[in-house]
Amino acid sequence: MAVYEILKMGDPVLREKAKPVTRFNSNLGRLIDDMFDTMAAARGVGLAAPQIGIGKRVCVVEVGKRRFELVNPEIIEAEGEQCDAEGCLSIPDYTGRVKRFQRVRVKAQDRKGETFIAEGTDLLAVAFQHEIDHLDGILFVDRVENDNPEE
């Protein structure tokens, strides 16, 4: 498997809206496997294809023992609120507090094109939202809450 270089903030690819996947073949499977390897090598919990320079709607998430490959994901239900510190493999050495939904349901496809629903709460919900934001050209720094309400 290959480990890709992760693009850093400032690279224009990170600000582009990724295109839907329409071909479900062995190339997609290899990409997903390589994304899991890249994420693990970087010690992350999620990685979106645009972070490795590929403008497709693909992301991978691993929280605890739960591992997800999300192709063409969309949030179909969300509730609650949480505001916690986030970081990003594309923005090393920076964290900020981000307001996110506490629970989300995501409709996505797997590498074979099969549709499924994934539900996440707490950190898993944050990871889903963070990676789907990447697919829309949004970085977590765009959503950082002001830590000092008097500023």
Curated annotation (Swiss-Prot):
Enzyme Commission (EC) number? 3.5.1.88
EC class: hydrolase
- Asked if Iron is a keyword of the record, the answer is yes
Give the binding site residues for Fe cation.
Answer: 88, 130, 134
List, in alphabetical order, the GO biological process terms annotated in this UniProt record. co-translational protein modification; translation
> Could you confirm whether the keyword Hydrolase appears in this record?
yes
Catalysis: reaction(s): N-terminal N-formyl-L-methionyl-[peptide] + H2O = N-terminal L-methionyl-[peptide] + formate
Alphabetized Gene3D superfamilies for the sequence: Peptide deformylase (3.90.45.10)
Give a short account of what the protein does: Removes the formyl group from the N-terminal Met of newly synthesized proteins. Requires at least a dipeptide for an efficient rate of reaction. N-terminal L-methionine is a prerequisite for activity but the enzyme has broad specificity at other positions.
Keywords for this entry?
Answer: Hydrolase, Iron, Metal-binding, Protein biosynthesis
The major lineage groups are:
Bacteria, Bacillati, Bacillota, Clostridia, Eubacteriales
* Domain of life of the organism encoding this protein: Bacteria
Q: Where is the active site?
A: 131
Reported cofactor(s): Fe(2+)
Q: What is this protein called?
A: Peptide deformylase
Which Gene Ontology molecular function entries are recorded, alphabetically? metal ion binding; peptide deformylase activity
> Can you quote the record's cofactor note?
Binds 1 Fe(2+) ion.
Homology family: Belongs to the polypeptide deformylase family.
Against CDD domains, the record matches this protein to: Pep_deformylase
